[in-house]
A protein has these predicted regions:
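Generic structural signal for well-ordered alpha-helical scaffold segments
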Residues: 37-40, 122-126
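Active-site-proximal alpha-helix that buttresses catalytic centers in soluble enzyme cores
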Residues: 2, 7-66, 112
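Phosphate-handling substructures
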Residues: 62-120
């Protein structure tokens, strides 16, 4: 039986400030690096990562002697107009309220919908 582990990248500055960080290619922050150094996982047979720097850095810290394969389709969702902003910065944006009211079912303005992101991610697993 094949086991697939989905591991979220370590903390970034954007995460620290509760920003929507999707296509923004930012590195791990020092705290994120330190936290990852205290985590261990069993050695996997293969490692597939997003092309984003934070994901590659996470894999390198967790599995330092293993080769990683970059899969473009595994990249995070494109948050469009909400990218690199947090809820406080978006609170007066009517598009943000409409997205909230839709329970996140609407596409991000100028970005992807959950369905588009999921379909792209699924392609990466095939």
């Amino acid at each position: 039986m094949i086991k697939i582990w989905l591991i979220r990248h370590g903390m970034t500055e954007g995460n620290r400030h509760q920003r929507y960080i999707g296509v923004t290619d930012e590195p791990l922050c020092p705290e994120g690096i330190e936290r990852l150094k205290n985590i261990t996982y069993p050695k996997p047979q293969a490692i597939f990562v997003s092309p984003l720097r934070r994901c590659q850095e996470t894999a390198e810290i967790l599995f330092p002697e293993q080769k990683v394969r970059i899969i473009d389709q595994l990249a995070e969702c494109d948050f469009g107009a909400f990218e690199n902003k947090n809820y406080k910065e978006l609170s007066d944006d009517p598009r943000y309220q409409a997205w909230i009211d839709s329970n996140g079912m609407m596409a991000f303005p100028g970005g992807e919908s959950k369905e588009e992101c999921a379909a792209r991610n699924l392609e990466g697993f095939q």
